[in-house]
């Protein structure tokens, strides 16, 4: 198993600091939040991307994925969505990252219409991603919270460069047990995103193991040769404790869960 954390937990932090923290606490990689308020995003210049690669190489830390905000199931024209997908794929390729994260975003649409949008756009985006050695991962999130909902889309796309990102919070909120999520997502899974919260109504992040999410079951269902990525949502919950103080405990907790299922 390899371990990463998301830079969502370090809002606005320089990449060098994120990479240093990852290396110091035994994390193999970073999930890079690709938003204009962060150091790296689709608008970053070639020189900035090259500098980022040097920083990461020096720290011995990989980029697991580029976390974008494209909503592939949303209403509207296709071309703006496809342009965002292409930009995210190019950024991932420049950072030597294997994955791009996207959201469904189909709230307010009939399920059939949202699925049709997602299938069409992911099919086109995957064809582009394949040429760059990148996979586009649809996260279990918002309108498609469960593994079953995401798998229904991806089964129709049926391209190797379109896959799934399993966010264990959202499948839990959707009432789907981890074993069922794993069964649904198995043909498509890119990696697993872990986190913890106090309850379904109190989503302020807490340290791994300090909340109510079924993390032991999720880790037991995760592929042994895959990645676990801790997404600590500090950006959306400023009052939450600072991530650096919990990295060592979080990494050790995940390792214990992995060891327990060997």
Question: Residue spans of the language-model regions?
Answer:
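A short acidic, helix-capping loop that chelates divalent metal ions and anchors anionic groups
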Residues: 36-41, 72-76, 106-112, 173-175, ...
